[in-house]
Curated annotation (Swiss-Prot):
Belongs to the PA-phosphatase related phosphoesterase family. It comes from the Eukaryota. This is Lipid phosphate phosphatase epsilon 1, chloroplastic. It comes from Arabidopsis thaliana. It is found in: Plastid, Chloroplast inner membrane.
Length: 279
């Protein structure tokens, strides 16, 4: 009897339990959701024995993925900011805007000088054309005599003392100031225009140094020589040639022919050199 009852008890005890409580069901449902999320990024086979490992791995992968995205976004933003700052630096400090202004300065000054010549259209204007080109020729002669090298950073090998740009710009600026003072006299308007002309000329001259095409001494010497030559040329006209020009037709024709010859020679120089430099 005892043996039969123990046999019944053994047969009655279940060999395995198929009952799932609510907590185990929730845990397994979460495990399946985590495994499905991970399987989207990479094929991963999850077994029931590695539930805790999968949970920890999924949380780590998720956090690393988020951190990686944030770090990648931060690197992109930092790279964009650095590139923008470099572009602004190039535009401001000489690789961009100032380099463009420096290349255009000779055209701006030439247009200003031509406008003054056309507005004056008198003997002094013709005399100024001759003087401006003579001043440029003097600069070339002085460069050959002094034979001072340019800054080592520039690619140009010709002499740099004195600066031809500084000498020409100074001549034209001083002539423009003298013309304004002659037209308007000494008043607030003439002083303002004169200061504006000198400031613009000084800025163009300074660009030769900031662009490392000349040293400071080269542009200073060029500016002094150009200014003194203009004053001397202007004084020579008023004291020696003005009365002769107004009284003699031969002098008028001679000055006109000289000015036309110098102007044509300068135009040929512009075509052969300035446009080549732009290319």
């Amino acid at each position: 009897m005892a043996a039969s009852s123990s046999l019944l008890l053994l047969l009655h005890c279940p060999t395995c339990n198929f009952y799932f409580d609510s907590s185990s069901y929730l845990k397994r449902s979460r495990l399946s959701s985590y495994s499905s999320i991970i399987s989207r990024g990479s094929p991963l086979f999850v077994s029931s024995f590695g539930s805790m490992t999968v949970k920890r791995f999924s949380s780590r992968v998720g956090s690393r993925s988020n951190d990686g995205n944030e770090q990648f976004g931060a690197l992109e933003q930092e790279s964009f900011i650095n590139n923008s700052s470099e572009i602004r630096k190039d535009l401001v400090t000489g690789g961009g805007i100032e380099a463009i202004v420096n290349r255009l300065s000779k055209w701006v000054v030439s247009v200003l000088f031509g406008s003054i010549i056309l507005l004056r259209h008198d003997g002094a204007a013709l005399w100024a054309v001759i003087g401006s080109i003579s001043n440029s020729a003097l600069s070339v002669v002085l460069k050959r005599i002094l034979n001072q090298e340019r800054p080592t950073t520039t690619l140009r090998s010709d002499p740099g003392m004195p600066s031809s740009h500084a000498q020409s710009i100074s001549f034209i600026s001083v002539f423009a100031v003298l013309s304004v003072m002659e037209w308007l006299g000494t008043n607030g308007v003439s002083l303002f225009l004169s200061g504006l002309i000198l400031a613009l000329g000084s800025y163009f001259i300074r660009l030769r140094v900031s662009q490392k095409l000349h040293t400071s001494s080269q542009v200073v010497v060029g500016a002094i020589v150009g200014s003194l030559f203009c004053i001397l040329w202007y004084t020579m006209w008023n004291s020696l040639l003005r009365e002769a020009f107004e009284a003699s037709l031969l002098v008028q024709i001679s000055v006109f022919l000289f000015a036309a010859t110098f102007a044509l020679a300068f135009a040929a120089y512009v075509v052969l050199n300035w446009f080549k430099d732009e290319r």
